[in-house]
Each structure stands twice: as structure tokens, then as C-alpha cells.
Amino acid sequence: MSANESVVTADLKPRVPSTGSVDVLIVSGRSGSGKTSVLNILEDLGYYVIDNMPLSLLSDAAHKLTEDGGITNLALGVDIRTLKADSASFSAIYDTLLNSYGPDKVRIMYVTAQESVLVARFAATRRVHPLMAVNDYEIKNLPSAIIKETETLRPISGNADITIDTSQLNIHQLKELVREYVGADNQITVNVLSFGFKYGVPIDADFVFDVRILPNPHWEPQLRVKTGKDTEVAAFFANFPQVEEMKQDIYRYLDRWLPEFLHNNRHTVTVAVGCTGGKHRSVFLAESLYSMLSESLPREIKVMVKHREKAHWKA
């Protein structure tokens, strides 16, 4: 890192886009500094991410996505691969975006790290610096590549609204820093999902509860056509204390541990409740847990319910 390079990791200016507004964030930085990690974090926060697009297409793509595609949060990754052949045109493209969206809607985030840290990271990953891989500049060693890259990225770093030095940051600290900058709230979503084991276990489930041990309304002819959402099925389950016991056991566990996800940078948690066909037992418990958790969990946690096998239900 050069002596005159300014690094800011505090006093951030949070972005809090108003409803319906467009937020364009240009993300750039030195190779090995964590730019890709930042883009992944932004994607998790709901940004539509484009990385390594040719500069000549950047402005048109932004307009296409925001005006025709309805994208409101857009992150554009620009690095040495994009910039090296056309660095002089970045300022013009940046001005075009500013004129189109307004100066308060277009920001630049520049990611960097100390040169010694970058060298250590390249050594640890055994990756080749992009400028050495193509060798357009006849660069023979990593320190020279880092210096040349820093010079090439100067049009971007010089206009940056925020520069993040990742030298001493772990991934969790980086996430919090990015979240603070973009003004993201601390909300997570809990998806309560009913499913049938006969159709497979959901691969994205964080918790899976098997309720096949409970009495099955399927074997009652008058209930077979019903679902776990029907009052007749609820009345059936009311005759079996173990149904209420299992519901309370699952609820107490989730009520205790789901809030902990707020402290671990999780934004979506899927709670899957499974029975054989995904029509009676799992649906009843999923609906019950949805109602109970909606009442008890902190308001930062949004609870939703979905029944995966609904298409298999028969009238």
C-alpha cells in the first residue's frame, strides 16, 4: 500500500435507499483484497451483482437492469481485468451513471489491503496475480504487479466514497462493515416449510424435524382428503397428547435458538417439518409453529410458512 493512499474503515456514510429508488454501488479493489467477498456479501443483502463486465457495456447494462428489469439495488464489480485495457474511459462512464441516477444514488466502494498482506494471501492460495497471468505489462514479480494494479485503479480509488482496508478484518467484521455502509437492516427471515419424505428432504433446510412418529390422519377415510390446515384434522390431533408435546418441544427449541442467528450474519433460516406425504402431520405442525413463532420471536425476524407438497394434495 502506498504511503499516500487513504484508508477509511470508520465514519461510514450509510446508504438507506428510499422505497422505489435505485442504488448503484460500484465495487473495485486490489486483487486479493476481498472484492469478491464484498460482492458475495452484497448479493446476500439483496443486491443484483454483475462482476467483470467490460466497461463499454457497464452503463447500458445498468440502465437495462434498473429501468426494464426493475432492479433497485445494483452492485457493479470493476477490477484490473475490466480496467486495464480501458482505464481512461472509467471517469466518463462514472459521470454518465451520476448524471443518470444522481450523485446520491451512485457510490464507489474500494477494497484494499496492505501490500505485505496481499503478498501473503497470494502465497497462501497459490494463485497468480491477474497482471502476471496475462503479462501485458511484462511484470515479473508480485510486488511489481501490485504496484501497477494500484496505479491502474487510481481513477476508481480516487473517487471512492469509502475505502475498506481488509488487512486486519475477518469475514464477519467485513460483513458488518458492508452492511453498515449500505444501510441494511438486521432482519432475517425464518421459513417454516412442510414437506413429504417420499419426495425428498429439502436440501436447503437448516433444521429438519421428522414427525412421522405421530398418528396419521391419512388412515381415517373421512380425513384422507383433508389437509393439516383443516379444522377436522386439528380436532383429530387434539385426541393425541404426543402431538401437542412434540409441537411444544420443537417450538421451545426454535424460540430459544433462532434469535442467535441474528448474531451470526444469517439472513434466511429454513425450518423443515416432514411427514410421509407432506399433507397432514407436517402441515399441521408447520402452521402451528408459524403462528407461535410469529408471536414470540423478535420483530426483526420475519416468519413465513410454505407447504412444498401442495401440488400433490388432492381434493
Swiss-Prot record:
SUPFAM superfamilies: P-loop containing nucleoside triphosphate hydrolases. Pfam families: PapZ_C (PF22740), RapZ-like_N (PF03668). Keywords: ATP-binding, GTP-binding, Nucleotide-binding. ATP binds at G29, R30, S31, G32, S33, G34, K35, T36. The keyword Repeat does not apply. Displays ATPase and GTPase activities. This is Nucleotide-binding protein PsycPRwf_2129.
